[in-house]
């Protein structure tokens, strides 16, 4: 995505990064949210296998992942690896405003509606407070997310190495 530079710190050995984090999962609440700033289908095989093992050993009943919209037809097959847990997915749409999604290079066609996204995903991630953003757009996206999704997050843009700039007025 245009606003993202997270890919610059990826590890050549992701399981070595992920394993110590996953070893901390207790299962106390029966829910696990795997946040990786990417798509679950792109996790390495060792990490996926460890998550599946944790689901069974720790009695996880609900498992959340993030996935790009392009994986929408693979969600069911991927979910089967984690039975008996209910697997839910969120999509980083960032905005329901097609012009903004295109400018951010989200790879989600401008004709894709919130209803279409909700056919596949139970949650969405929204992004706000970039230069050119507006309070009205943010509130509209929140209202759409409330109507169509069981879960949504509103993420405030943080300065990074990309050309996208933060709107400090909106932040405050």
Roles of regions detected by a PLM:
Residues 1-4:
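Short cysteine clusters
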Residues 6-20, 28-45, 55-73, 86-111, ...:
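Core AdoMet radical
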Residues 16, 42, 165-172:
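Long, ordered, amphipathic alpha-helical scaffolds
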Residues 44-46, 101-105, 134-136, 164-167:
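Short, solvent-exposed loop/turn segments at secondary-structure boundaries
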Residues 17-24, 141-143:
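A short, acidic, amphipathic alpha-helical segment used as a generic capping/interface helix at domain edges
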Residues 55-59, 80-84, 118-119, 146-148:
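Short, conserved loop/helix-junction motifs that constitute active-site signature segments
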Residues 110-165, 172:
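Conserved C-terminal portion of the radical SAM core fold
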Residues 43-52, 72-82, 135-138:
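Distinct, well-ordered alpha-helical segments
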